[in-house]
Amino acid sequence: MQRTFAARYPASDPLDLGEGTVVVLPSLSFPTAELRKIVGIGYYEERLLFLLLLLRRPAVKIVYLTSMPVEEAVVDYYLSFLPDPAGARSRLHMLAAGDPAPRSLTAKLLDRPELLDRVRELCDGPGGAFVQPFNVTAREQALAERLG
C-alpha cells in the first residue's frame, strides 16, 4: 500500500483523495506498563473518528481498526455530518480485534492474521489503499508491510 502512495498523491493533501481506501490505525504503540497508566485508554482509539468525514466522497472507503467495537451512536454522530449518512455507512468497515487488554492495537492486529486478511480483502478495489496511523513505530511499519 505505502509503496505507491507518494506517486499517486505527490502534490496534494493525502487525505483529499478522490477514490481509494483509507485504513485508519489509531494505535498507541507504547510499552504496556505505560499504557496501563492511561485512564480511559480504550477511548483513545476513537480520536481519529473525524476521518470518517472523508466518506463525503462517494469513491472513498474507510476501514477503521479498533481493539473493541465503537458504540454505534458514536459512529452515527460522525456520519450525521455527511450529506448521505447511509451511503457513507455502506463504505465504512469498522473492524475490532475484540481484545480490551492494555497493549497497542498494532500488536493485537499483528497477532491476528485472519483479521489482517480481512483488511486486505476490504482494500481491494479502485484507487488503492493506504494506512493512516496515529503514530509510527517499527510495529506500524511491519503492519503496513504485512498488509501489502
Report residues per predicted region:
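ATP-binding N-terminal substructure of ATP-dependent carboxylate-amine bond-forming enzymes
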Residues: 1-148
